[in-house]
UniProtKB/Swiss-Prot annotation:
InterPro entries: ExoRNase_PH_dom1, ExoRNase_PH_dom2, ExoRNase_PH_dom2_sf, KH_dom, KH_dom_type_1, KH_dom_type_1_sf, NA-bd_OB-fold, PNPase. It is an enzyme of class 2 (transferase). This is Polyribonucleotide nucleotidyltransferase. It is found in: Cytoplasm. Gene3D superfamilies: GHMP Kinase, N-terminal domain, K Homology domain, type 1, Nucleic acid-binding proteins. Mg(2+) binds at residues 488, 494. Residues 555-614 form the KH domain. NCBIfam families: polynuc_phos, PRK11824.1.
Length: 713
């Protein structure tokens, strides 16, 4: 019934198996990939005809994690998987980015790749084999995909690279880098690092590319056994149409792309487009030399050809800058008066308002995944409204792009955050992109770094970021610093680098063409370093380090420790004691299982009051010490006094006074304040108190002899 085919190899100490022919046989391509006990199912399906009028490549990648993969049941009312999690969205993007450029130019048939995690061993993350599976499924499907690609994760510890580190090894690693590529080219890099040098980062990319080669060979071997016949697709030849457009408006486009202001430039490009349409499309009565669909495609190609050629010939950019020149920067801290920390970061026509908000442990984000529920103390949310590019559009929840850009900035800043024990606040960053013309994610890095310093978050060092680009034609190339949006679209590489003066904290690279060598990547990294240092200098005009104190608008906080055996005393039966502390002081109190108590309030007085009450509860009463207490109940044989936090003790009637009394009510009533001395504990551990040895006016101890004589009456 099944025609199973598989390949296996030992890869970084574990067995990788890719199998096809048993599951999802109606998909054009389907593989099961296993690494350790982590298993994914990857499928690829493509439409055999393009939709009429389709003018872009409709590739969709969906990565999904099933809770059953790790033996868990989803939370919530419906108890089933819901909208994509951040992890699923980021992994979908991770798969999309290296495979998209490898489809044949002009292919506009709908393609859908679905990768599902079916088993998760809590050691091997599924994202790497998800990439491998997507690549294998596409190769087997017969789609015009110029793969396969491989992928690998690289860690770094004690000066050594670690290929495909486990989850536990990643926690100790200074680097988490994912690289994907073909046999001879790197296509995508995504990373988070602990201020590592450019050489170490480049070495990690090379190490990962070398490590994935056996996987690429395995996919090719499987394809030789099980691949479908290649889909008959002939890329359209638009060379004559392209030449017609360039001959007609090439000079106009070259002139338009030298205009610095984005709005004026787009107006000039629009005029050139209208001129070309009039000359080449003709009318209904007299058709022109090409169809509107072909014109739309080749006009974009003409733009790219003109811009790329001008940059390589003249060494000058679209807006007149030199290759390594950064746009003018204006950085301002404390931009908004009532926020905890804020900044306005403007670089050319890209601008971000970044805001820091500090909260308590109550504000931590709970993240539910295959490995359980985790709490995150640092959040960064990136918003890209349509007005930032002068357009109208849908306003709603964060899309894939916004989630991806936010996570890139999150990775860039994570390395410089203070340890939680030194700064126990939950931090939420928000970046509102108010203008965009390239590199808004790196503006977010710079702006959020300033906003956190403005809020008083003690970052180890400021972080800046820069987006690099590349124009590559044969052996000629130009590396561009601080690229514009147009340079991103028309270029061959989008290379984002963020870091401090000490090293790189995040690196993201997307390459659209083969042929980018290690030397070119090295030059781009080195040029990016110079740009980052320049940007740090401009940021330093606003703030060079965190402010010495927190914003007056932020909550104040203090952490204390209590013995673990005292936690139940602080909480009380049904939370009665801790609620009483909160109600009486106005402070928020959170206590962890290890005895860490987080106390926060808007004023210091409330915090001090809460600390005093907690210490009163957890401190140990000492025999022989004198305490002030309150009468809480009266019996015939004596009174019970609350004298040390929640502690009550008995003052026997014989210990109330240096004279004989018949009933406690002759001396006190409930609610009276009295002074007592802790005499000790009885055989059952009950507290024994005495009033008669203490002067009830002053709280001073009376002479022992007087007390002893009176007790013998």
């Amino acid at each position: 019934m099944f025609n199973k085919q598989s390949v296996s190899l030992e890869w970084a100490g574990r067995t990788l198996t890719i199998e096809t022919g048993q599951v999802a046989r109606q998909a054009d391509g389907a593989v099961m990939v296993q690494y350790g006990d982590t298993i994914v199912l990857a499928t690829a399906v493509f439409a055999k005809e393009a939709k009429p009028g389709q003018d872009f490549f409709p590739l969709t990648v969906n990565y999904q994690e099933k809770y059953f993969a790790s033996g868990r049941i989803p939370g919530g009312f419906f108890k089933r998987e819901g909208r994509p999690t951040e992890k699923e969205t980021l992994t979908s993007r991770l798969i999309d980015r290296p495979i998209r450029p490898l489809f044949v130019d002009g292919f506009k048939h709908e393609v859908q790749v679905v990768v599902t995690t079916l088993s998760y061993d809590l050691e091997n993350d599924a994202d790497i084999i998800a990439l491998v599976g997507a690549s294998a499924a596409l190769v087997l499907s017969g789609a015009p995909f110029m793969g396969p690609i491989g992928a690998a994760r690289v860690g770094y510890k004690d000066g050594q690279y670690i290929i495909n580190p486990t989850i536990a090894e990643l926690e100790e690693s200074e680097l988490d880098l994912v690289v994907a590529g073909t046999t001879d080219a790197v296509m995508m890099v995504e990373s988070q690092a602990a201020e590592l040098s450019e050489d170490v980062m480049l070495g990690a990319v090379v190490a990962g590319h070398d490590a994935m080669q056996p996987v690429i060979d395995a996919i090719i071997a499987l394809a030789e056994k099980a691949a479908k016949e290649p889909f008959a697709y002939e890329p359209p030849d638009h060379s004559a149409a392209l030449k017609s457009v360039i001959d007609t408006v090439g000079a106009d486009l070259s002139k338009a792309y030298k205009i610095t202001a984005k709005g004026e430039r787009y107006a000039a490009i629009g005029a050139a487009k209208d001129k070309a349409k009039a000359a080449l499309l003709g009318t209904d009565e007299a058709p022109g030399v090409m169809t509107p669909e072909v014109f739309k495609t080749v006009f974009k190609e003409a733009e790219a050809s003109v811009v790329r050629g001008d940059i390589l010939k003249t060494g000058q950019r679209i807006d007149g800058r030199k290759l390594d020149q950064i746009r003018p920067i204006v950085a301002e801290a404390g931009f908004l008066p009532r926020t905890h920390g804020s900044s306005l970061f403007t670089r050319g026509e890209t601008q971000a308002i970044c805001v820091a908000t500090l909260g308590t442990s109550d504000d931590e984000q709970y993240i539910d995944g295959l490995d359980g529920t985790k709490k995150e103390k640092f959040m960064l949310h990136y918003n890209f409204p349509p007005y930032s590019v002068g357009e109208t559009g849908r306003m709603g929840g964060a899309g894939r792009r916004e989630i991806g850009h936010g996570k890139l900035a999150w990775r860039a800043l994570k390395a410089v955050l203070p340890k939680h024990e030194d700064f126990p606040y939950t931090i939420r960053m928000v970046s509102e992109i108010t203008e965009s013309n390239g590199s808004s994610s790196m503006a977010t890095v710079c702006g959020c770094s300033l906003a956190m310093m403005d809020a008083g978050v003690p970052l180890t060092r400021p972080v800046s970021g820069i987006a690099m680009g590349l124009i590559l034609e044969g052996s000629e190339f130009a590396v561009l610093s601080d690229i514009l949006g147009d340079e991103d679209h028309l270029g061959d590489m989008d290379f984002k680098v963020a870091g401090t003066e000490n090293g790189v904290t995040s690196l993201q690279m997307d390459i659209k063409v083969a042929g980018i060598t290690k030397d070119i990547m090295g030059k781009a990294l080195e040029q990016a370093k110079g740009g980052r240092m320049h940007i740090l200098g401009e940021m330093g005009k606003a703030l060079t380090a965190s402010r010495g104190q927190l914003s007056e608008n932020a909550p104040q906080m203090e952490i204390i420790k209590v013995p673990t055996d005292k936690i139940r005393d602080v909480i009380g039966s049904g939370g009665k004691v801790i609620r009483g502390i909160v109600d009486e002081t106005g402070a928020k109190v959170n206590i962890d299982d290890d005895g860490t108590v987080q106390i926060s309030a808007m004023d210091r007085k409330s915090i001090d009051a809460a600390i005093k009450m907690i210490k009163g509860i957890t401190a140990e009463a000492e025999v022989g010490e004198i305490y002030e207490g309150k009468v809480v109940s009266m019996k015939d044989f004596g009174i019970f006094v609350n004298f040390f936090g929640p502690k009550d003790g008995l003052v026997h009637v014989s210990q109330m006074a240096n004279k004989r009394i018949g009933h406690p009510k002759e001396m006190v009533k409930e609610g009276d304040k009295v002074w007592v001395k802790l005499m000790g504990f009885d055989e059952r551990g009950k507290v024994r108190l005495s009033m008669k040895v203490v002067d009830q006016e002053t709280g001073k101890e009376l002479a022992e002899e007087a007390g002893d004589d009176a007790s013998e009456d």
